Curated annotation (Swiss-Prot):
Binding site for ADP: 152-159
EC number: 2.7.11.33, 2.7.4.28
Any one GO MF annotation of this record: ATP binding
UniProt-recorded name of the protein: Putative phosphoenolpyruvate synthase regulatory protein
InterPro entries hit by this protein: Kinase-pyrophosphorylase (IPR005177), PSRP (IPR026530)
Catalytically driven reaction(s): [pyruvate, water dikinase] + ADP = [pyruvate, water dikinase]-phosphate + AMP + H(+); [pyruvate, water dikinase]-phosphate + phosphate + H(+) = [pyruvate, water dikinase] + diphosphate
Keywords: Kinase, Nucleotide-binding, Serine/threonine-protein kinase, Transferase
Organism: Pseudomonas fluorescens (strain Pf0-1)
Family: Belongs to the pyruvate, phosphate/water dikinase regulatory protein family. PSRP subfamily.
Length: 272
């Protein structure tokens, strides 16, 4: 079964998309076509949005699922005329919370991601810059400032995990790709030895690694199953020999991988 899902907001759409994606992930047997539509902040945009939703409904033969964080009542009423199933994220959770706290919420556009009111903004930017500057072993002389250093074979998910932890939690995470030479020596590169307490390993199933590498360099030694199987086997041997905690990333989302790493290493999030 195929269904369409829209994440609609008069702000950035981050809240609608994040929560909506998490909810849809619980329905593994349904394929969703997902559309994020931020800054739907005028009557004209809302009417155009209704046309998109209705077209998706006609194409799919099912009502699209709509996750929205729209504040403006006029815009919400226009969206409600569409042939979609609407889930108002804020009102769903705020109404019972207001009752419990006996306080009205400041239901304002972009409140949860407002730069002006978010003391974590600079921490987030600095963490992302750190992850980018220290990606793929490009620099190693700033590892003393890292909260974590992810290690593993090429294309096992190190970079997206580092960026996710930076964006979501302000974690300064570097990553270092272990090469064939490192594996044959069965010892950590010199750049990592002084920071072994910060290391966390990522591994991956060889067949999945083969598929990923074939998208980048098809029909090469780098992407061959034999090479991928060798690298995975040897890097896991290295992790065990050096007592480096590690996780197989094959069947986990980047959110799950990040959470497991932070728990295992006991690293505190800079913001929550």
């Amino acid at each position: 079964m195929k269904r369409s899902a829209f994440f609609i907001s008069d702000g950035t759409g981050i809240t609608a998309e994040t929560l909506g994606q998490s909810l849809l992930a619980q329905f593994e047997n349904i394929t969703f076509s997902k559309f994020t539509r931020p800054y739907i902040d005028s009557v004209e945009k809302a009417r155009a949005m209704v046309q998109q939703i209705n077209k998706a409904a006609e194409t799919d033969g099912f009502r699209p699922i709509i996750f929205d964080t729209i504040v403006n009542q006029d815009i919400r009423e226009i969206l409600a005329t569409s042939n979609g199933f609407m889930i108002d994220i804020f009102s769903t959770f705020l109404a019972p919370l207001e009752q419990e706290l006996t306080e009205h919420s400041s239901y304002t556009v972009g409140k949860s991601h407002s730069i002006g009111h978010n003391s974590n903004y600079m921490e987030r930017i600095e963490a992302v810059n750190f992850a980018l500057d220290n990606d793929d072993g490009a620099r190693t002389h700033y590892y003393d400032k890292a909260d974590l250093i992810l290690v593993g074979v090429s294309r096992c998910g190190k970079t997206p995990t580092c960026l996710y932890m930076a964006m979501q939690f302000g974690i300064r995470a570097a990553n270092y790709p272990l090469t064939e030479d490192d594996m044959e020596r069965l010892q950590l590169p010199a750049a990592l030895r002084a920071h072994q307490h910060k290391l966390f390993g990522l591994t991956i199933d060889p067949d999945r690694l083969t598929a990923i590498r074939n998208e980048r360099k098809p029909n090469s030694r780098y992407s061959s199953y034999a090479q991928c199987e060798f690298e995975v086997r040897e890097v896991e041997n290295l992790f065990r020999r050096e007592n480096i905690p590690h996780i197989n990333s094959t069947h986990f989302s980047v959110e799950e991988i990040s959470a497991k790493i932070l728990v295992e290493k006991g690293v505190e999030r800079r913001f929550k």
